[in-house]
Amino acid sequence: MVMFKKIKSFEVVFNDPEKVYGSGEKVAGRVIVEVCEVTRVKAVRILACGVAKVLWMQGSQQCKQTSEYLRYEDTLLLEDQPTGENEMVIMRPGNKYEYKFGFELPQGPLGTSFKGKYGCVDYWVKAFLDRPSQPTQGTKKNFEVVDLVDVNTPDLMAPVSAKKEKKVSCMFIPDGRVSVSARIDRKGFCEGDEISIHADFENTCSRIVVPKAAIVARHTYLANGQTKVLTQELSSVRGNHIISGTCASWRGKSLRVQKIRPSILGCNILRVEYSLLIYVSVPGSKKVILDLPLVIGSRSGLSSRTSSMASRTSSEMSWVDLNIPDTPEAPPCYMDIIPEDHRLESPTTPLLDDMDGSQDSPIFMYAPEFKFMPPPTYTEVDPCILNNNVQ
């Protein structure tokens, strides 16, 4: 019977554990081994991998696909470590043995580290400890990679605009139309940027409508000729009600890009895309939706912002740092300060549900309930009787 020797410690440690790597950069670290008793080691090996994987069940069929970005193998050696017979390393208790490693990530596009419901992009280093007459022992450590997406390219700095009109009917009788046109100054943004929205809304139907905007993520998984798409709302902002026969405009309505992963556009089995949806909720009818594509980058484009955007950011930073605005501003609209940002708990939740979780779009206009003033306070003690008793 073979007795298995226990290893006290066997781990992969990176030189910079918090670092996020990019293409062409060097990943360096060491494999640390400590033993409980004298142990002979044939070799310490590492395998570094970067793989995109998608997997889901469609009926009884398993849809599965992989795409490899990185594969690196090496056998590590100790520095100035005596070896025994057959070139084996003799490890003794109380000592710490460190095997250094280093490799460069491939040049060119790499998939950004990502974990989704039906797929992921993972990078890791796995170490193997080979011992005679003992099973190979392994340990694994993940590291993070971000594919650099430069939002300062001419294509991503160009404005994006769209417009749409919808005819509304009630019981097959025409009931006017709802139209929306919108524009944003650029297509590429980074985490923390403010999207300045310029939009015009017109409502000629008999219903009250509500304009809103939302940043939406779309995760697309492809395998075996099948496609799975999940959509998730990340943050949103809304405007005031637009009554029948009126128009409304947004001039620089602001929506902040939350902490999200950069777009993944170069992978052939997994994509992460973002959009700005500007839409109008019409009671009893489908929404009027504009879809403006966004690219979320990993390299800031602050140097190329417009002066209005720069002044807006500067004003907000002054408010945060000094708690005193540089110049007095008009108070915000009440509806603008109501927190509307929310994240769907499940990616399978329908996007932009017709009910919107609130009753802020009544079909008919109504007057608020009239409330009478409360009666004055009174007492059951007659003041006249009280005065007579005193006299």
UniProtKB/Swiss-Prot annotation:
Record PTM Phosphoserine, positions in chain: 361
Reported modifications of this chain: Ubiquitinated; undergoes heterotypic 'Lys-48'-/'Lys-63'-branched polyubiquitination catalyzed by ITCH and UBR5 resulting in proteasomal degradation. Deubiquitinated by USP5, leading to TXNIP stabilization.
Presence of keyword Cell cycle: yes
Keyword terms: Cell cycle, Cytoplasm, Disulfide bond, Isopeptide bond, Phosphoprotein, Transcription, Transcription regulation, Tumor suppressor, Ubl conjugation
Keyword Transcription regulation set for record: yes
Record Gene3D superfamilies: 2.60.40.640
Cross-link Glycyl lysine isopeptide (Lys-Gly) (interchain with G-Cter in ubiquitin), where in sequence: 212
InterPro entries: Arrestin-like_C, Arrestin-like_N, Arrestin_C-like, Arrestin_domain-protein, Ig_E-set
A GO biological process held by the record: negative regulation of cell division
Gene Ontology MF annotations: ubiquitin protein ligase binding
Entry's family note: Belongs to the arrestin family.
Record's function text: May act as an oxidative stress mediator by inhibiting thioredoxin activity or by limiting its bioavailability. Interacts with COPS5 and restores COPS5-induced suppression of CDKN1B stability, blocking the COPS5-mediated translocation of CDKN1B from the nucleus to the cytoplasm. Functions as a transcriptional repressor, possibly by acting as a bridge molecule between transcription factors and corepressor complexes, and over-expression will induce G0/G1 cell cycle arrest. Required for the maturation of natural killer cells. Acts as a suppressor of tumor cell growth.
Subunit structure: Homodimer; disulfide-linked. Interacts with TXN/thioredoxin through its redox-active site. Interacts with transcriptional repressors ZBTB16, ZBTB32 and HDAC1. Interacts with DDIT4.
Protein name per its UniProtKB record: Thioredoxin-interacting protein
Organism field: Pongo abelii
Gene this protein is translated from: TXNIP
